[in-house]
Swiss-Prot record:
Lineage, highest ranks first: Eukaryota, Fungi, Dikarya, Ascomycota, Saccharomycotina
GO cellular component terms, A-Z: membrane
Membrane topology, from the record: Single-pass membrane protein
Note: Partially overlaps PRP19.
Species name: Saccharomyces cerevisiae (strain ATCC 204508 / S288c)
Name by which UniProt lists this protein: Putative uncharacterized protein YLL037W
Main subcellular location of this protein, as a coarse class: membrane
UniProt superkingdom: Eukaryota
Length: 126
């Protein structure tokens, strides 16, 4: 009986430790994200899920809010129907671009991993 109680208490402590470690690891990411030579986004990483629609320049900033996926997508209208999307890794501040035509792609933070896995084949280095 006592050993079972000790086992439950130990499992609760272990679970709490891993939960707190995961929670605080989400908070440890840069607040500002920049692209070398041409700045595409500066601001709090947790607010980049906002979508900006303007009459002349359509742009969308989408992100995963500091989780382990570490992706930020910046879509900008380059004048015609071509939309340039910049894929930024928060850890390396590396950037790649892909060209798409047609409608503006909008991703929910829940589906940010689709950009990393599904669109990996269509991504070209800047």
């Amino acid at each position: 009986m006592l050993s079972r109680l000790i086992q439950h208490i130990t499992s609760i402590f272990v679970f709490s430790f891993f939960f707190l470690f995961f929670f605080f690891s989400l908070k440890r990411c840069p607040r500002d994200v920049k692209r070398e030579g041409n700045e595409i986004f500066t601001g709090n990483v947790t607010t980049i899920t906002q979508v900006y629609l303007e009459s002349t320049n359509v742009s969308a900033y989408l992100g995963c809010q500091c989780n382990n996926i570490e992706t930020i997508i910046c879509l900008q209208n380059s004048g015609n129907t071509t939309i340039s999307a910049y894929h930024v890794h928060i850890s390396e501040i590396g950037s790649v671009a892909l060209q798409t035509e047609g409608a503006l792609l909008v991703f929910s933070p829940i589906f940010c991993f689709l950009v990393k896995f599904v669109y990996r084949q269509r991504i070209a280095l800047v």
